[in-house]
Amino acid sequence: MNNEQKSIKKELVFSSGKGRVTSSGLIDGSLSFSFKSKKDSAFIQVTDPIGRKVLLIWATSIDLTARNLIQNKQYDSSEIEELLPIMKVVQPNELIKFLWGEKVQYRKKDKSIPLEVRKNIDLRIKSEKGLPYSIMDFYDNLLDQKIKIQIKSRNINKEKIFLKKYWKLLKY
């Protein structure tokens, strides 16, 4: 990366966009989401097919927290991993990178991921329609679960965003 590219990258401070999560297997269905992200954190709002906000997700480089708005339940990282096995192999910082259009690092030989998980997981990242790294396909052979996360639109710009107001939603 040359100095000009580094300078441009430093100026990009905010990313937002929309996408869709499609799942089959343990959980079948499709939900839309929107996101707002800084380089070190992200806020994701998931809506059901009729447009109701159903799940709010906060990601930092090391942690995930989610709130189910229908059941008024809050989940920490370990509970999220049980509900969404994809999060066993995609760390929160990698999820943030994906929202920015950067390649997610998943190493099948990563010893920090249990062998049983590594043997049964297939994760592929693809680009589509001019959007870099906009599709994440996950397949768990053991659970016969497929999850596809697709970014439909992504805006990256120099505007500053303050995610503090979104973090306050955790406290209700």
Q: Can you annotate each of these PLM segments?
A:
Residues 68-71, 112-172:
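Non-transmembrane domains of secretory- and envelope-associated proteins
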Residues 41-93:
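An acidic-aromatic
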Residues 9-10, 34, 53-57, 124-129:
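Short linear motifs in intrinsically disordered
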Residues 1-36, 166-172:
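N-terminal leader/targeting segments and the immediate start of mature chains
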Residues 36, 60-62, 78-84, 128-131, ...:
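A short, sequence-level motif marking secondary-structure junctions
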Residues 81-122:
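Extended, positively charged loop/linker patches that create polyanion-binding surfaces
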Residues 27-29, 51, 119:
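Residues that act as N-cap/strand-start positions at coil-to-secondary-structure junctions
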Residues 13-19, 27-35, 40-46, 55-57, ...:
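One face of beta-strands
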